[in-house]
UniProtKB/Swiss-Prot annotation:
CDD domains: GrpE. Residues 1-14 have a biased composition (Polar residues). It comes from Sorangium cellulosum (strain So ce56). InterPro entries: GrpE, GrpE_coiled_coil, GrpE_head. Residues 17-26 have a biased composition (Basic and acidic residues). GO terms for biological process: protein folding. Keywords: Chaperone, Cytoplasm, Stress response. GO terms for cellular component: cytoplasm. The lineage of its organism: Bacteria, Pseudomonadati, Myxococcota, Polyangia, Polyangiales. Participates actively in the response to hyperosmotic and heat shock by preventing the aggregation of stress-denatured proteins, in association with DnaK and GrpE. It is the nucleotide exchange factor for DnaK and may function as a thermosensor. Unfolded proteins bind initially to DnaJ; upon interaction with the DnaJ-bound protein, DnaK hydrolyzes its bound ATP, resulting in the formation of a stable complex. GrpE releases ADP from DnaK; ATP binding to DnaK triggers the release of the substrate protein, thus completing the reaction cycle. This is Protein GrpE. It is found in: Cytoplasm.
Amino acid sequence: MSDSEQNGSNQNTGETAEAHAERAEAAEQQASTPEDKLGEAQAEAARMREQLLRTAADFDNFRKRSRREVEEAQRRGREAILKDLLPVFDNLERAASHAESAPDAKSVAEGVRIVTKQFVDTLDRMGIKRIAAVGKPFDPSVHEAIQQLDSTEHPAGVVIAEVQPGYMLGDYLIRAAMVVVSKGSPVEPAPAAN
C-alpha cells in the first residue's frame, strides 16, 4: 500500500472514528435522558399550566370589567334620559296642580298642549320618532292590526285609525303602533235570482 493510500485510509478511519464517537455520545445521551426528558416535560407542563391559569384569570377579569362597563354605560344612558324627561314631568306636575285651582279648562288644556310639545321635542332630541300610521299602507313590521273595518273612503290594507302610537329609536322598533285597518268597500251580496 502506498503512503497516500494509507493516509486516505487513516483519514477515513479518523472520520469514521469521529462519527462513531459522536454516535456513541448521542446514544449515551439518549440512554441517560428518559429521566431528563421526563423532568423537562414536567417543567414544560408546569409552565403551560401556569400560563393557562394566568390566561384564564385575565379572561375572567376582562369579562368582569366588560360587564361593569356595560352596566355603567346603561346607567349613564338611563341618567341622560331621566335628565331630559324630568323637566317634562315637573311641568306635568305644575299643570296638574294648576288644573285643581284653574277657573277654566281652556288654560289647563293649553298647559297640557305645551307639556306635550315639550315631551315630543325631548323624544325627538333622543332620536325617538313616532311611527306614521293613519292613511299609510299597513306595514306589519311597524303596525299591529287590532281590528279591520269596511271602509268606502279607504282602499283595503290602509290604516284608518290609530289606537295607540308606535315609536322607533333610529331603525329599532320600540313599540308597534296599534291600528285599525281598512278591508275596503263592503261587498254587497248579489240579488237573488227568482
